[in-house]
Amino acid sequence: MLDDQIILGFETSCDETAIAILKGDELLVNTISSQVDIHEKFGGVVPEVASRAHAEMIRNIFHASLNSANLQISDIDIVSTTDGPGLVGSLVVGYNFAKSVAWSIDKPFLTVDHMVGHLAAPLIENRTMKPPFMTLLVSGGHTQIVLVEEWGNYQLLGTTIDDAAGEAFDKLSRFCGFGFPGGPAIQKIGEGGDPNKIELPRPKTKHEYNYSFSGLKTAATNFLNNLDPNDKVTKADFAASYQEAIVDSLLSNFVKAVNETGVKNISGGGGVMANSRLREKMNIFA
């Protein structure tokens, strides 16, 4: 049983060095060091820079987390870390550090799939949530529709065949000079804009539940390149329309999967789920 065991978790799959410490179900510490300021000047995450930043930060964050929880390293019962998917160099930093901690105190070492972590995240707010349910996982590198038949039994119904939704936000934001990360930047610029002002495609794929965002990104950049200076299109209208196209595409396949499988409960996970328009429209469907 894990009721009173102290669990130390590491997450370094992309551009955040994160450490959490739990005692059973109680969260004692959740420390996150973001690299957004480091990567902003590049317009996106640079893998080599990210792994170096993890290596520079992880030891300090580890000791700060122990101090915040008023614990000694010997108090830890289980050590866990993300082992993928993600940036290889970043994952290696967290994996090696976590494994060395587990080895030094002779405690169990567990690895966790990044996407399963996203999938289980709704349990933080709703401990009573039980399978079966359908989950929309939307992050910087992944876009997936997953049927959770039971814990440990997951069926991947749909995924992206090219860019993930997060990449679609980031790449267009970089092209337009809106800022990084692209999702929050486009959402902020699009506030007050007309999401129906610009007609952008909602790409379809041969597989009914799969996604494709490269065509949408190309259509948006072509629109800007061919824009007549006399056209009355604001940044807010453009950003809102692009965001709406991504959200509509995400929910179209997800709603179809839910309806065709007959699953009653739904959830969402991943960084892109922080998008307020996506959450709003998903709540309407729910």
Predicted regions and their residues:
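A short helix-loop
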Residues: 2-7, 12-13, 20, 29-30, ...
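Short glycine-aspartate micro-motif
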Residues: 7-9, 80, 90, 133-137, ...
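A contiguous, well-structured pocket-lining segment that forms one wall/lid of small-molecule binding clefts
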Residues: 72, 188-266, 275-285
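General beta-strand structural signal in soluble alpha/beta enzymes
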Residues: 81, 109-114, 182, 268
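DPxDG-like acidic metal-binding loop motif
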Residues: 86-105
